[in-house]
């Protein structure tokens, strides 16, 4: 005879709150200080991320660590000529390039989008999300700091928003609960054994 249904996980929630940033000094490291997501072209649709550790591929295109293209305000890619002398990214997301001839060029602008319900985004791995019915559609791309989006910090990365103190506390509480339940089972077994012995 089975008594009870055991235990199972309910929901797994993702915390979308902002966290502290850490300076890296690297031009392609970008952190959103506030609400918002970068738009990413995965090849089979648009995804969204807050992870701003970007790179340049062999064609000079701005990509994620997995090689997905980072999109600009207009939904296009951002490309730095491979022979450019230098480039910078401003806090407004604008990419400025000094080409091989020493001339300044506009490299486009990184846009940030927001959602009515970020908690409703679907996780697809590699710190990427897709919009869902629960999240609503993404807003139009905004310049960082506009339209309710957070500002852009260049040369910084957002750290984990996990509170280790809270997590350790919850783990200890769960461990104590498990130990108490184990003790109850042991005591119940002992009582049943005593009853069996009395019957004999």
Residue ranges and their predicted role:
Residues 1-200:
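Amphipathic alpha-helical polymerization modules
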């Amino acid at each position: 005879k089975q008594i009870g249904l055991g235990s199972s996980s309910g929901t797994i929630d993702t915390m979308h709150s902002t966290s502290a940033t850490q300076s890296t000094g690297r031009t392609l490291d970008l952190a959103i200080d506030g609400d918002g997501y970068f738009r990413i072209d995965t090849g089979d649709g648009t995804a969204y991320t807050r992870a701003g550790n970007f790179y340049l591929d062999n064609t000079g295109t701005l990509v994620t660590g997995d090689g997905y293209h980072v999109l600009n305000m207009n939904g296009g890619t951002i490309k730095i000529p491979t022979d450019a002398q230098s480039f910078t990214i401003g806090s407004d997301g604008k990419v400025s390039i000094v080409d091989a001839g020493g001339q300044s060029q506009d490299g486009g602008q990184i846009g940030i989008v927001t959602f009515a319900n970020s908690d409703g985004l679907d996780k697809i791995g590699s710190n990427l999300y897709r919009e869902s019915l629960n999240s609503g559609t993404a807003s139009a791309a905004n310049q960082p700091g506009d339209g309710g989006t957070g500002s852009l910090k260049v040369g910084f990365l957002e750290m984990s928003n996990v509170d280790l103190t809270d997590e350790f506390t919850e783990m200890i509480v769960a461990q104590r609960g498990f130990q108490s339940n184990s003790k109850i089972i042991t005591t119940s077994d002992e009582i049943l054994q005593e009853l069996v012995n009395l019957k004999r």
